[in-house]
């Protein structure tokens, strides 16, 4: 069965219940959340996340598997500022606790950026950070995300991710989140040869580690190292390639999460595309009028 959903918001008093309600309104059967704002460390107590009501709503609507995304202020690749590294380690630990409390098994993490010290130094620091964070007892896996390679990001190649995984003691607690926009922007030819890319992933990392897919089109050509998401079928990856990935038999059990941009010129009146994009991917037919339909919410 196709597991498809999107990033949804966990906010207000309803928290996890609000996230599940939003996902159901899009016709989703999985979803991804940040446990608070992705750009800061302010978090509600676990007791205030409304977990029981959220889980009941999920069960009622057949949602069994959800994903958490770690905030992007965490940078355990930072070799230059010990405070940034220490904050990243401490905050990642608390996010894992929250992920466990919510009942999710995967927390997606941007591996980190070396901020000028070079990829080797950044990777060593990321390994150090993950070794401080991971415990044998935890039930959650950290899903290292494939990165586009913009700026000083580490994890732009399968080899870099494998290097991180190989260096970590409890690496059974590590998995991978494959982002279509990022891998395309990093230079992988997922448009014409996705099976070849998947074989390469299997050879270097192992398909058994692939636990989350981020399904995004890209505003930029392959190899641009930009990381700018586009709506499904309206970018340089295109509908056919993304549809092929979403329905790929080897990836059937993996949750596919859309992180495509809201639609509309007026920043105060942007519309979420997810209901329409999910329906289009289920139907496996590209709709050229999709963006208009999203704005009119037809």
From Swiss-Prot:
Reaction(s) catalysed by this chain's protein: Endonucleolytic cleavage to 5'-phosphooligonucleotide end-products
Binding residues annotated for Zn(2+) 1, in chain numbering: 69, 110, 145
Record Gene3D superfamilies: Divalent-metal-dependent TIM barrel enzymes
Annotated cofactor note: Binds 3 Zn(2+) ions.
Pfam families: AP_endonuc_2 (PF01261)
InterPro entries: AP_endonuc_2, AP_endonuc_F2_Zn_BS, Xyl_isomerase-like_sf, Xyl_isomerase-like_TIM-brl
Binding site for Zn(2+) 3: 182, 227, 229
One example GO MF annotation: zinc ion binding
EC number: 3.1.21.2
Known cofactor(s): Zn(2+)
Keywords: DNA damage, DNA repair, Endonuclease, Hydrolase, Metal-binding, Nuclease, Zinc
GO biological process: base-excision repair
Binding residue positions for Zn(2+) 2: 145, 179, 214, 259
Protein task: Endonuclease IV plays a role in DNA repair. It cleaves phosphodiester bonds at apurinic or apyrimidinic (AP) sites, generating a 3'-hydroxyl group and a 5'-terminal sugar phosphate.
HAMAP family linked to this entry: Nfo
Recorded family membership: Belongs to the AP endonuclease 2 family.
Protein name from the UniProt record: Probable endonuclease 4
Organism lineage: Bacteria, Bacillati, Bacillota, Bacilli, Bacillales
């Amino acid at each position: 069965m196709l597991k498809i959903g999107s990033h949804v918001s966990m906010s207000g008093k309803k928290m996890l219940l609000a996230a599940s309600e939003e996902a159901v309104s899009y016709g989703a059967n999985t979803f991804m959340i940040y446990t608070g704002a992705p750009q800061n460390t302010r978090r509600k107590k676990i007791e205030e996340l409304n977990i029981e009501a959220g889980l009941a709503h999920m069960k009622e609507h057949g949602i069994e598997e959800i994903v958490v995304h770690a905030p992007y202020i965490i940078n355990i690749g930072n070799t230059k500022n010990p405070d940034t590294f220490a904050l990243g380690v401490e905050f990642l630990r608390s996010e894992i606790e929250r992920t466990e409390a919510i009942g999710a098994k995967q927390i997606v993490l941007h591996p980190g950026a070396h901020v000028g010290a070079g990829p080797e130094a950044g990777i060593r620091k990321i390994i150090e950070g993950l070794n401080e964070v991971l415990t044998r007892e935890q039930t959650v896996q950290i899903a290292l995300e494939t990165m586009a390679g913009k700026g000083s990001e580490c994890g732009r190649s399968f080899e870099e991710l494998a290097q991180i995984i190989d260096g970590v003691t409890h690496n059974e607690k590590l998995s991978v989140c494959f982002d279509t926009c990022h891998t395309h922007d990093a230079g992988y030819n997922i448009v014409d040869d996705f099976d070849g890319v998947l074989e390469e992933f299997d050879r270097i990392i192992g398909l058994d580690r692939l636990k989350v897919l981020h399904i995004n089109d890209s505003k930029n050509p392959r190899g641009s190292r930009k990381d700018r998401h586009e709506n499904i079928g309206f970018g340089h990856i295109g509908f056919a390639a993304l549809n092929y990935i979403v329905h790929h038999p080897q990836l059937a059990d993996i949750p596919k999460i859309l992180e495509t941009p809201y639609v509309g010129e007026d920043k105060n009146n942007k519309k979420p595309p997810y209901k329409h994009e999910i329906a289009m991917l289920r139907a496996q037919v590209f709709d050229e009028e999709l963006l208009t339909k999203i704005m009119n919410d037809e």
